[in-house]
């Protein structure tokens, strides 16, 4: 089905926007904002904000997380995307786009509280990634249902990601120079 959709793409908007796509191809990308979004197939940042091609530099990962700054550690994909957006593309804004019903956050919640049947091996890439949630999980209240705690974790994970973002020196420098919000 992917090949079929690809073959019909030129007829579904490409032809009427050919000059814009030509401009993007020749001039390169100059996005105004970076969006760090969940890789959940239901979350489409360009559709949510009505963005055009070339407007956003988008990085997607499980649960829209930003790891702590750690040049000698793991998670270089997200860190490299942030560095590229800030230092090479000079984006003016970074948005962490959290969402409700996030399967990654739900999985992270059950992994953090060691819910039977939801555990991951220490060698799991998913577990290592979702360990970024630990500081947000540790702040959850003791009272409430699992569903309420997961909804709170969805919000707190964005806060932790923004705090982690502020630990990147090039992000701090761009903010201090009024080039980034």
Label the model's feature ranges:
Residues 1-31, 64-80, 84-92, 103-181:
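Divalent-metal-activated hydrolytic enzyme cores
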Residues 28-46:
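Conserved H-X4-D acyltransferase segment
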Residues 36-38, 60, 95-99:
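Short beta-strand segments
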Residues 41-65:
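Catalytic core of membrane glycerolipid acyltransferases/transacylases, capturing the structured
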């Amino acid at each position: 089905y992917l090949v079929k959709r690809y073959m019909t793409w030129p007829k579904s908007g490409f032809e009427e926007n050919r000059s814009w796509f030509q401009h993007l191809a020749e001039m390169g990308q100059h996005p105004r904002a970076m969006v760090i979004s969940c890789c959940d197939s239901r979350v489409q940042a360009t559709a949510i904000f009505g963005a055009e091609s070339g407007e956003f530099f988008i990085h997607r990962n499980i649960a829209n997380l930003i790891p702590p700054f750690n040049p000698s550690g793991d998670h270089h994909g997200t860190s490299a995307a942030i560095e590229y957006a800030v230092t090479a593309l000079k984006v003016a804004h970074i948005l962490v786009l959290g969402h409700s019903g996030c399967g990654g956050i739900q999985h992270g919640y059950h992994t953090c509280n060691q819910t039977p049947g939801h555990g991951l091996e220490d060698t799991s890439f998913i577990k290592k990634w979702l360990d970024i949630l630990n500081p947000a999980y540790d702040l959850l209240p003791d009272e409430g249902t699992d569903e309420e705690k997961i909804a709170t974790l969805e919000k707190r994970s964005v806060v932790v990601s923004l705090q982690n973002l502020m630990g990147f020196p090039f992000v701090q420098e761009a903010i201090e120079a009024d080039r980034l919000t």
